[in-house]
Amino acid sequence: MDVNPTLLFLKVPAQNAISTTFPYTGDPPYSHGTGTGYTMDTVNRTHQYSERGRWTTNTETGAPQLNPIDGPLPEDNEPSGYAQTDCVLEAMAFLEESHPGIFENSCIETMEVVQQTRVDKLTQGRQTYDWTLNRNQPAATALANTIEVFRSNGLTANESGRLIDFLKDVMKSMDKEEMEITTHFQRKRRVRDNVTKKMVTQRTIGKRKQRLNKRSYLIRALTLNTMTKDAERGKLKRRAIATPGMQIRGFVYFVETLARSICEKLEQSGLPVGGNEKKAKLANVVRKMMTNSQDTEISFTITGDNTKWNENQNPRMFLAMITYMTRNQPEWFRNVLSIAPIMFSNKMARLGKGYMFESKSMKLRTQIPAEMLANIDLKYFNDSTRKKIEKIRPLLIDGTASLSPGMMMGMFNMLSTVLGVSILNLGQKRYTKTTYWRDGLQSSDDFALIVNAPNHEGIQAGVDRFYRTCKLLGINMSKKKSYINRTGTFEFTSFFYRYGFEANFSMELPSFGVSGINESADMSIGVTVIKNNMINNDLGPATAQMALQLFIKDYRYTYRCHRGDTQIQTRRSFEIKKLWEQTRSKAGLLVSDGGSNLYNIRNLHIPEVCLKWELMDEDYRGRLCNPLNPFVSHKEIESVNNAVMMPAHGPAKNMEYDAVATTHSWIPKRNRTILNTSQRGILEDEQMYQRCCNLFEKFFPSSSYRRPVGISSMVEAMVSRARIDARIDFESGRIKKEEFTEIMKICSTIEELRRQK
């Protein structure tokens, strides 16, 4: 079918067509190899932007540190990180003046959160730098390892289960002269296989104790591990992102809680809301500027871009902001919030895996770990790498680079938004005291600036003043990449505004298709994505119907479940045909069992099992929804599940979909190969962790939404719960006296064992 593509756009306004130029179809680019080079780039760039600052040495770790704060004012347009403390504090004061009580109220809200947050908050999140093993781990495992090490070193405040008490342990750990940790290592030995009589390498996992002195421990506690950001579209070069360890995470969480609470009260902030709510909020600001500029004024909007936002931000500036925002608050609260920026001022960047060398002639490959970069001969490297290493060498300690200025990606999104909004806030007429005034939108490093003035000269003056104000706070608006236009057409966080926000549908493209979880979840997610896009993103009925047909086709190819009467031969077609022939009511078969598709755009909100329930054969229904079916390892399914959708940019979104537990909701088994690697010890820890949690959930069925509060340990809580339940069951006659006595005896034994331990 040949279509002339230009015909498609005859009636479409340019703003709608622009979404087709976004690089969101096909697979995104992934990075291979190490991120060491990208990390060195980040460290070197960050120091270059602040190069005229003051050098000092950290007395504890010996790391050289560069402090650009209150440094020389810029004389050119080059990006720079010389924020001026007094300017930042003044911007904060004006922000408070135009929003009376904003900091006070947010502090009160945050204090409540601090008192109530449980330590399991830190198990959220993906890969985390695990300082005990010096590499990345799933967040829950990294937290468990940290707590285990803390307890074996006599730090036990965390046993209360409150995050704030865990953070007290972190503070104490930094004062200790040494910390003892358990590390995993691999032993390899050659043994003869009994069956094949060949020599094979046998790997065993050992655990050994290791002592870290204060300096080594501090370096690890302040380390951010770096990786390459994957799946970034529309970029030629990759870049590094950081993952902090458990010591830093809790403190960052509380700072961001305060900043989030402030952002919610600021009309110019694009965070923390999203989706339609965000569009409505932003449209309000634009409407205000347009209605006020009707007759005498002209109005222009800048689609803004900042140069290297995080690399010019400075943790010391954030410390000044926090000190100001919490100035009338209790001492303990101010201390808790000031620790994150202090740790970031002393942060170390781990350089990753190092470099891989291969010799074509000798067919050899060898890895040069990051720790060796400090003293290896540079003749092996090409020019650009050699320059990088020479530049970074003075900053290296044990394979990590001292990185005092700059913030790594994504750490303080909310707080940096507050900083950006404080500049926009200065644009009101009462502050500019001239004929022009301005407003705008800020979302992390992305901004849109709206300037109103009687004439073009006024607009230019307004933009210039904004540009210079930004420089004073360490923000660098890029003159090359920012674009000015009559108000009414601009772009902000990939939303295109044209007298109202257009749907940028192309950004949703990656989430269409088959997710690959299991047959049940995939069907549910697929139709939910189509439904959501009809609601939120202008997906019209005809296109939605087509999307649905394509999805069903894709689904059938993925799971090889073509209709029972099809001619297509696949690995499953034999079984599916057999089922088709012996089924009386063929309309009741699920698509994944070779049934036909009953979905259309009107019933996308109904799970497939419910849609076909009345049409199913009795015995098919019984097999499909049989919890005792031995061929299926079930997960316990809540009525609503969450899928993690990766939108085209921005953080992964949680998408809810209806889940009906059937024999199609299977979980694939773990790959065997992991069991022979050094990961095995970790896997065993993880399984034990999982078992404990499952057991706990059995005792407290409601614990999925309410954690038992109090100082007791998990075991104590379960024992006391068992006693209460047993007594109730005994008194109501549900269990016999013998059973009751036995339960009580087991409880006493458990307590006795705990005492002996």
UniProtKB/Swiss-Prot annotation:
Ribosomal protein found in the keyword field: no
Any Gene Ontology biological process: DNA-templated transcription
GO molecular function: nucleotide binding; RNA binding; RNA-directed RNA polymerase activity
A Pfam family of this chain: Flu_PB1
RdRp catalytic domain boundaries: 286-483
Renumbered ranges of motif Nuclear localization signal: 187-195, 203-216
Residue stretches of biased makeup (Polar residues): 55-64
Keywords: Eukaryotic host gene expression shutoff by virus, Eukaryotic host transcription shutoff by virus, Host cytoplasm, Host gene expression shutoff by virus, Host nucleus, Host-virus interaction, Inhibition of host RNA polymerase II by virus, Nucleotide-binding, Nucleotidyltransferase, Phosphoprotein, RNA-directed RNA polymerase, Transferase, Viral RNA replication, Viral transcription
EC number(s) from the headed UniProt entry: 2.7.7.48
Posttranslational mods: Phosphorylated by host PRKCA.
Consequence when changing D538G: In strain: A/Fort Monmouth/1/1947-MA
Positions of the UniProt region annotated as Promoter-binding site: 249-256
Compartment(s) where it occurs, according to its Swiss-Prot or TrEMBL record: Host nucleus; Host cytoplasm
PROSITE patterns: RDRP_SSRNA_NEG_SEG
Main location: host cell
Family matches, as Gene3D superfamilies: 6.10.140.720
Quaternary organization: Influenza RNA polymerase is composed of three subunits: PB1, PB2 and PA. Interacts (via N-terminus) with PA (via C-terminus). Interacts (via C-terminus) with PB2 (via N-terminus); this interaction is essential for transcription initiation. Interacts (via C-terminus) with human PKP2 (via N-terminus); the interaction competitively inhibits the interaction between the RNA polymerase subunits PB1 and PB2.
Family recorded in the similarity comment: Belongs to the influenza viruses polymerase PB1 family.
Function per UniProt: RNA-dependent RNA polymerase which is responsible for replication and transcription of virus RNA segments. The transcription of viral mRNAs occurs by a unique mechanism called cap-snatching. 5' methylated caps of cellular mRNAs are cleaved after 10-13 nucleotides by PA. In turn, these short capped RNAs are used as primers by PB1 for transcription of viral mRNAs. During virus replication, PB1 initiates RNA synthesis and copy vRNA into complementary RNA (cRNA) which in turn serves as a template for the production of more vRNAs.
Name of protein: RNA-directed RNA polymerase catalytic subunit
Organism (species): Influenza A virus (strain A/Fort Monmouth/1/1947 H1N1)
Designated gene of the protein: PB1
